[in-house]
């Protein structure tokens, strides 16, 4: 387990999932190269639980979209900051970020979290 994680929740058009997976795989490899301890992404498939708030409401998922949840692991917040700085300075990442994205980044939920329980 990690001392610090970044969590991302974002809607992605179903038809763009193959493109999204290729792009995310490249980004994950770049983040790992620059020190990220783990990079994982998940596709939502059980998001309607009775008497609970659906994560679909967080980003107002539209028809034809699916919800992706991602987690990146780091030793600490300062380690995360160092990794992100190196990653974003990488010419390959800069080039990738200049292209079209398979999701609307303005609807992405993002935050950094410290571990409070480890069992």
Named regions from a protein language model:
Residues 9-10, 29, 100:
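Alpha-helical interaction segments
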Residues 4, 8, 20, 39-42, ...:
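Aromatic side chains
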Residues 1-25:
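Long, hydrophobic N-terminal alpha-helical segment
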Residues 18, 78-80, 118:
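Residue-level signal for secondary-structure boundary sites
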Residues 32, 36-63, 89-119:
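Glycine-rich beta-strand-turn "strand-cap" elements at beta-sheet edges
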Residues 17-19, 29-35:
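Short, well-structured hydrophobic secondary-structure segments
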Residues 21-27, 83-91:
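Short amphipathic alpha-helices in soluble, non-transmembrane regions
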Residues 5-12, 51-87:
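Short, well-ordered beta-strand segments in beta-rich or mixed alpha/beta enzyme
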